[in-house]
UniProtKB/Swiss-Prot annotation:
InterPro entries: Plexin_repeat, PSI, Semap_dom, Semap_dom_sf, Semaphorin, WD40/YVTN_repeat-like_dom_sf. GO terms for cellular component: plasma membrane. It comes from Pongo abelii (Sumatran orangutan). This is Semaphorin-6D. Shows growth cone collapsing activity on dorsal root ganglion (DRG) neurons in vitro. May be a stop signal for the DRG neurons in their target areas, and possibly also for other neurons. May also be involved in the maintenance and remodeling of neuronal connections. Ligand of TREM2 with PLXNA1 as coreceptor in dendritic cells, plays a role in the generation of immune responses and skeletal homeostasis. Keywords: Cell membrane, Developmental protein, Differentiation, Disulfide bond, Glycoprotein, Membrane, Neurogenesis, Phosphoprotein, Signal, Transmembrane, Transmembrane helix. The gene is SEMA6D. It is found in: Cell membrane. Residues 875-886, 965-981 have a biased composition (Polar residues). Glycans are attached at residues 51, 283, 435, 461.
Length: 1017
């Protein structure tokens, strides 16, 4: 239960974080008004239809004063009566014409300007009072201003200079307004547009301005709007961010304010300059761990009341070199005031970052306050402010904090399109109860978006894109380029339910709603969620107004719930060439589709995101549990398999190796199965030029025609050290023949010699260890432990001795049996204490001549060194030469008895009876090493015996092979033993050595015995 609650808590936390940092998606419009429908709307072009010779409008500004719309353009100002309902074209009622003089146009051309620029573009149109209007124009790059009467548009008074009141170029932005009888303007004050200024003129008092060429005050600004609120005048603009210069050139949106009663500074500081100028950043961004900013202010409204709060609403875009993106943000005037009461920002050195100024360093009275108000109430005018206050505000005009948007997020965003939003108009009292806020936003592509805004942070619904209107009329506006499609300004005429959309070459009048498009389909009317539309009692969809409350209507702008409504079966006529003569006809240009059953069912985005995320987490958890369980079962199964395999292999290897290594202590001869695989014999100690077979099987190997090297016979394996107990010759013969028959019949299976005991057979007490012949680096041989190599060796011998007959094979077999019989007789006589050594040597001489090995010199291959084996089986390296004969060691039979050191006895040959002989089985008797060592009685304790010079041809599986007598090592019993030799130790007898120069005659008579745990020589 605790785990479940913990998971639920984590899930809710992640959902809340996801909602907080998720980037808002673009909403699809509920309805779309395409060009075929919108081109019926009336258009104002500034010239009568058919008069194409007249210049285009060159729209500059648009202002609504009471029931008249003033449209200013190039050389002219038009008035439009809003009470008239135009049909296809908007006709101006009056026109003001103000053209530049010829001299001014010539001077403009002399300054290098194009003739199309050398005209009078009206940039300022500000009412001074109810009767007079202040008008300024560029006047061919020589700005001038005039007063006109509003009623008649007649010129009244004299021309005054437009410097610092009107820009020189029509492409430069500017704002102006009258407050308390004074003109506040913001523009550029020179021909090169390098001196940006916020300027106050006219009225009583001296003119004031911002500091010239001071980037801390303003830097390359674009002024957009100015409003009067309380004791201040607010300017909204965008500029190059001076606090961002160290990180690159970026544009920030600003709001600046000045006191209306500002009189400038003293003669020492800020004389004829603003003493109350402060500015702050407008922050329109998507919240999250890393904010996404819309920094470029494009347009902003006047102060409007939204939910009883004085608010300004602006449209912001991303940087010009960034991805296209736009947002609509609202700012409370209270939040703006709060920021101006906050901390200041400063840069201590030109290369340092901007930081906040501590409050204790802010002088009194607080900079930015208005004289006779608030903290500066004691001062009559700003001229009386202390120099410290004036100096501080001169160098610290920027506030540290930025103005946050209402609800800390944009009301609406548009980021999945290639165009940016450029203009805005807001109806803050839409709907029959005037409780909805509808935003109209223009764009660069000539598209107007109609948005039902989410104005409350506690609302369950986000903003909804109601309509997407393609407003630009290609046929009537005569666009010269794509820039002409940009919406420059929007003017709302709520009283006449119209929106005027201004382009550079025309102004189009668009109704605020298109309720007639839904006809008699109630479901479509309700699902539109348009505050201007409702289902009327007459059974049709129409526009609702506050005066229609008593008549009754049905509307659901909050949710658009149509679940209780049936489908619309009426299909409105579709016309590809609609009749646009009837304005607003219910069927003109409408393309309609039959509504499906639940097509208008809307699911809130937060609910959808929550459900999808919960399903994903649940699925991931289930999948993780399943994978974990399966993996755990699989790992356990593999461990069990590997454990069983290792146990079986360990048992097999250990038992087999034990049996093989204990082949020195073999029990009586038995016959065993031939299909049992033999484990690998010391594969880690001996190296070969051929790799072992993958299965590790070791089969019988046959000596090549040059003779099997004795090194392979050195391995202490049962095959190389047979033990033959005292038995009858007939019994031994039968066993040998039976073993030989099995070896000949099955060559591909592992072979066991009759002398080898089973892997787990107990050792016999009468067992006598045989001698071990160890490898020498001088011997050449070709060793292979693989079945394939043994098979190839056998085939090679058979191919070489191909002409031999079957009789030779039988003869070889008889000779092998005779050799075994001779060996048995020898052992029998050795165990007899009354036997005659000379008689025995006579028998040995006969058997000795039957088994001979090739000399070492006939070997052609170089054997690999086996240093590890020598180090492990011998004592530390001796001083014997590399070509010394084979070494031998005597292995004690009983582990519990301390081992004796092996004595090396050298001396001159005493007599021929001391000659050492070797008994070996033929190589075809399933021996992997090709050499078997025998046990022989010892006839003396030292001395060398001469190497016989005779050589004899022996047979290997019916093949005659010339072998020669080789020096060898053997274990020999002492004549002092009775019956079986005691298991306390063995004495070493001299080995057969090659002829070497004589050594000193002094040799020890008995070997020294040391209780060591390793063998020495």
């Amino acid at each position: 239960m605790r785990v479940f609650l913990l998971c639920a808590y984590i899930l809710l936390l992640m959902i809340s974080q996801l909602r907080a940092v998720s980037f808002p998606e673009d909403d699809e419009p509920l309805n779309t008004v395409d060009y075929h429908y919108s081109r019926q709307y009336p258009v104002f072009r500034g010239r009568p239809s058919g008069n194409e010779s007249q210049h285009r409008l060159d729209f500059q500004l648009m202002l609504k004063i009471r029931d008249t719309l003033y449209i200013a353009g190039r050389d002219q100002v038009y008035t439009v009566n809003l009470n008239e309902m135009p049909k296809t074209e908007v006709i101006p009622s009056k026109k003001l014409t103000w053209r530049s003089r010829q001299q001014d146009r010539e001077n403009c051309a002399m300054k290098g300007k194009h003739k199309d620029e050398c005209h009078n573009f009206i940039k300022v149109f500000v009412p001074r009072n109810d009767e007079m209007v202040f008008v300024c124009g560029t006047n061919a790059f020589n700005p001038m201003c005039r007063y006109y009467r509003l009623s008649t548009l007649e010129y009244d008074g004299e021309e005054i200079s437009g410097l610092a009141r009107c820009p020189f170029d029509a492409r430069q932005t500017n704002v102006a307004l009258f407050a308390d009888g004074k003109l506040y303007s913001a523009t550029v004050a020179d021909f090169l547009a390098s001196d940006a200024v916020i300027y106050r003129s006219m009225g009583d008092g001296s003119a004031l301005r911002t500091i010239k060429y001071d980037s801390k005050w303003i830097k390359e600004p674009h002024f957009l709007h100015a409003i009067e609120y309380g004791n201040y005048v607010y300017f909204f603009f965008r500029e190059i961010a001076v606090e961002h210069n160290n990180l690159g050139k970026a544009v920030y949106s600003r709001v600046a304010r000045i006191c209306k009663n500002d009189m400038g500074g003293s003669q020492r500081v800020l004389e004829k300059h603003w003493t109350s100028f402060l500015k702050a950043r407008l922050n329109c961004s998507v919240p999250g761990d890393s904010f996404f900013y819309f920094d470029v202010l494009q347009s902003i409204t006047d102060i409007i009341q939204i939910n009883g709060i004085p608010t300004v609403v602006g449209v912001f875009t991303t940087q010009l070199n960034s991805i296209p993106g736009s947002a609509v943000c609202a700012f409370s005037m209270d939040d703006i005031e709060k920021v101006f009461k906050g901390r200041f920002k400063e840069q201590k050195t030109p290369d340092s970052v901007w930081t906040a100024v501590p409050e204790d360093k802010v002088p009194k009275p607080r900079p930015g306050c208005c004289a006779k108000h608030g903290l500066a109430e004691a001062y009559k005018t700003s001229i009386d402010f202390p120099d410290e206050t004036l100096s501080f505000i001169k160098s610290h005009p920027l506030m540290d904090s930025a103005v946050p948007p209402i609800a800390d997020e944009p009301w609406f965003t548009k980021t999945r399109v290639r165009y940016r939003l450029t203009a805005i108009a807001v109806d803050h009292s839409a709907g029959p109860y005037q409780n909805y806020t509808v935003i109209f936003v223009g764009s660069e592509a000539g598209v107007v978006l109609k948005v039902l805004a989410k104005t409350s942070p506690f609302s369950l619904n986000d903003s909804v894109l109601l309509e997407e209107i393609e407003a630009y009329n290609h046929a009537k506006c005569n666009a010269e380029n794509e820039e002409d499609k940009k919406v420059i300004s929007l003017q709302l005429d709520k009283n006449h339910h119209a929106l005027y959309v201004a382009f550079s070459s025309c102004v189009i009048r668009i109704p605020l709603s298109r309720c007639e498009r839904y006809g008699s389909c109630k479901k479509s009317c309700i699902a539109s969620r348009d505050p201007y539309c409702g289902w009327l009692s007459q059974g049709s969809c129409g526009r609702v107004t506050p005066g229609m409350l008593a008549e009754g209507y049905e509307q659901d702008a909050e949710f658009g719930n149509t679940a209780h409504l049936g489908d619309c079966h009426e299909i409105l006529p579709t016309s590809t060439t609609p009749d646009y003569k009837i304005f607003g006809g219910p069927t003109s240009g409408v393309r309609w589709e039959v509504q499906s059953g639940e097509s208008n069912q809307m699911v809130h985005m937060n609910v959808l995101i929550t459900c999808v995320f919960a399903a994903f987490v649940l699925g991931a958890f289930i999948a993780g549990v399943a994978v974990y369980c399966y993996r755990d079962m699989f790992v356990r199964k593999n461990r069990k398999i590997h454990k069983d395999a290792e146990s079986a292999q360990s048992c097999t290897d250990s038992s087999g190796s034990f049996a093989k290594l204990n082949g020195l202590f073999d029990s009586p001869v038995k016959e065993y199965q031939q299909n049992i695989d033999s484990p690998k014999l010391y594969s880690n100690l001996l190296t070969s030029r051929k790799e072992l077979p993958p299965n590790g099987d070791t089969k019988s190997m046959v000596m090549d025609h040059r003779g099997q090297p004795p090194e392979l016979a050195a391995l202490p394996t049962p095959e190389s050290t047979p033990v033959l107990h005292q038995k009858t010759l007939q019994a031994m013969k039968s066993h040998s023949e039976k073993a030989h028959g099995h070896g000949a019949s099955r060559k591909e299976t592992p072979q066991f010699f009759p002398s080898s005991p089973p892997p787990h057979s107990p050792l016999s007490h009468g067992h006598i260890p045989s001698a071990i012949v160890l490898p020498n680096a001088t011997h050449d041989y070709n060793t292979s432990f693989s079945n394939s190599n043994a098979h190839k060796a056998e085939k090679k011998l058979q191919n070489i001795d191909h002409p031999l007959t079957k009789s030779s094979s039988k003869r070889d077999h008889r000779r092998s049996v005779d050799s075994r019989n001779t060996l048995n007789d020898l052992l029998k006589h050795l165990n007899d204490p009354n036997s005659n050594p000379k008689a025995i040597m006579g028998d040995i001489q006969m058997a000795h001549q039957n088994l001979m090995l090739d000399p070492m010199g006939s070997m052609s291959e170089v054997p690999p060194k086996v240093p590890n084996r020598e180090a492990s089986l011998y004592s530390p390296p001796s001083t014997l030469p590399r070509n010394s004969p084979t070494k031998r060691v005597d292995v004690p039979t009983t582990p519990g008895v301390p081992m004796t050191s092996l004595g090396r006895q050298r001396g001159y040959h005493k007599n021929s009876s001391q000659r050492h002989s070797i008994s070996a089985m033929p190589k075809n008797l399933n021996s992997p090493n090709g050499v078997l060592l025998s046990r022989q009685p010892s006839m003396n304790h030292g001395g060398y015996m001469p190497t016989p010079t005779g050589a004899k041809v022996d047979y290997i599986q019916g093949t005659p092979v010339s072998v020669h007598l080789q020096p060898s090592l053997s274990r020999q019993s002492s004549y002092t033993s009775n019956g079986t030799l005691p298991r306390t130790g063995l004495k070493r007898t001299p080995s057969l050595k090659p002829d070497v120069p004589p050594k000193p005659s002094f040799v020890p008579q008995t070997p020294s015995v040391r209780p060591l745990n390793k063998y020495t020589y």
